[in-house]
Amino acid sequence: EIPRQKKHISLIFHKNRLLSVGRNCFKTHPKAKEIGYAYEEMHSELDAYRKLPHKYRGLKLTLVNVRFNRFRQLRMSRPCELCTPWCLEVFDAIYYTDNDGIKRME
């Protein structure tokens, strides 16, 4: 259970193998401060990436972001304006949910 109203989950894959899972959380992190996140709290993308074993960094990685509301309905989970630049550098493909399903970030 994620103790937040907006529940974001980030999954990192390499060749269809799940390598890391992250969630938005109240925990602070120095990298979150460097990126400029409000209150220095980690977004799900950063949480997943920091948990990714170092041996996989630099490989072709896919990020999948999912968000759901309290009724477990899919909602918009596109990376925010602070996450997008570094995610585009790190991931070869980025997918996210919206109210209608899943989309690929272009």
Language-model-detected regions and their locations in the chain:
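Generic short beta-strand
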Residues: H8-L11, I94
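Short, glycine-anchored, charge-dense loop/turn motifs used at functional sites
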Residues: F13-L19
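Zn2+-dependent cytidine deaminase-like catalytic core
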Residues: S20-E106
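Short, basic/aromatic recognition patches
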Residues: E1-H8
